[in-house]
């Protein structure tokens, strides 16, 4: 956070808040990677150096400790440059198309996949935002590219891959968390 008020609330609730985010990395346009890089650099300036960076975004609360351990094991086993979590796409990408302003579905109607059963199409995967792992050295490099060479996918099931972007996602997450707690 860049807010002293939120930092104090966090401290009051037991969180460690070693420093506030810079103004540069506090805007809506700041990337998560820029913020993580800032944290690594600031700790480095204090003489605290880390080998590995694991980003667990709070908007993906359904991942489990097992997912974190298994993705880290994959990172180590493959000697990966990075690992990111993914899940199978719910609907085949072959059924996706762009709509023009006229809303005509020509691109779908003319698609060779329109009558193809989903089960016969190749599986596709999407980033789910739950887990990102890379070396701190990679994070600090001038040519940082998380998805470059030797980036491996850790596949997670759909029920743990919810990324909360709106009120509907939040309601679904709450429902799934209640179900998990039973």
What positions do the PLM features span?
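A short acidic, often aromatic-flanked loop/helix-cap motif at beta-alpha or helix-coil junctions
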Residues: 24-28, 91-92, 159-162
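Short phosphate-binding loop-to-helix
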Residues: 5-54, 62-66, 70
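Short beta-strand/loop segment that forms part of the nucleotide-sugar
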Residues: 1-3
């Amino acid at each position: 956070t860049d807010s002293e008020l939120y930092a104090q609330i966090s401290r009051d609730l037991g969180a460690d808040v070693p420093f506030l985010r810079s103004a540069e990395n506090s805007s809506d346009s700041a990337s998560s990677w820029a913020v993580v890089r800032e944290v690594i650099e600031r700790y480095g300036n204090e003489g605290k150096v880390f080998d590995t960076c694991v980003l667990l975004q709070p908007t993906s609360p359904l991942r489990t400790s097992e997912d974190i351990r298994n993705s880290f094991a994959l990172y180590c086993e493959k000697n990966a440059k990075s690992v990111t979590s993914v899940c199978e796409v719910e609907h085949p990408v072959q059924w996706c198309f762009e709509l023009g302003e006229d809303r005509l579905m020509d691109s779908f109607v003319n698609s060779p996949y329109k009558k193809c059963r989903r089960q016969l199409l190749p599986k596709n995967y999407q980033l789910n935002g739950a887990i990102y792992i890379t070396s701190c050295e990679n994070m600090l490099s001038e040519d940082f590219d998380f998805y470059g060479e030797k980036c491996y996918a850790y596949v997670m099931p759909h029920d743990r891959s919810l990324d909360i972007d709106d009120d509907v996602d939040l309601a679904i997450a709450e429902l799934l968390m209640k179900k998990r707690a039973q």
